[in-house]
Design a protein with these regions (language model features):
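Terminal-proximal interaction/regulatory segments of ATP-powered molecular machines
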Residues: 87, 91-169
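Conserved P-loop NTPase
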Residues: 8-102
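Amphipathic alpha-helical transducer elements in NTP-driven molecular machines
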Residues: 1-4, 25
Length: 169
């Protein structure tokens, strides 16, 4: 009855067969939020809300309408603790998309320069720290969270790190 009450998010990974049927690849197939308002059966009482689902045609995890439309108690709870996000789903969504763009750029860059160290914990931590430093700097300087400016400055930082090469080796 209460086994899911202490759980916020469930991430499910399963092996997925390739089109030829001969191979399997492990994929995250869903990211599901666990709501807290149910009493007896979370399945019958809409206690589970999918935020992302795997699409086998695109071989990608895709956002659901629930996530896009801000129907996430967890994200709203986190946002309520950030002055610029509280009650402003558009600002929250812009920040989610900014972070997604940064992660995508890191993956694409690591692939392009054939350096998987860009995706390892050490560089990811440095990248996140720089993202937060730039975000704070932009907010202080312009009094708004300008996601385009933040991305531009972060991307310039990334280019400098790649030129230094030894910064992630």
């Amino acid at each position: 009855k209460t086994s899911f009450k202490a759980t916020d998010i469930i991430i499910i990974a399963n092996p997925i067969r390739t089109a030829d049927g001969l191979h399997k690849k492990r994929r995250i197939v869903s990211i599901t939020e666990v709501r807290k308002e149910w009493e007896e059966d979370p399945l019958r009482e809409n206690g589970f809300v999918d935020l992302m689902r795997y699409n086998p045609k695109t071989d990608q995890l895709e956002m659901t309408d629930n996530l896009i439309n801000g129907d996430s108690d967890i994200i709203k709870s986190i946002a309520s603790n950030v002055k610029e996000w509280a009650g402003n789903w558009d600002a929250v969504w812009d920040n989610i998309m900014l972070r997604a763009s940064i992660k995508k750029t890191l993956v694409e860059t690591a692939t392009k320069i054939k350096n998987p160290l860009l995706l390892e914990a050490e560089f990811t931590i440095r990248s996140n720290d720089e993202f937060h430093r730039i975000s704070d700097s932009v907010r202080e300087k312009y009094e708004i969270i300008d996601t385009k400016r933040i991305y531009f400055e972060w991307n310039e930082w990334l280019k400098k790190q790649i030129k230094l090469k030894n910064s992630f080796a």
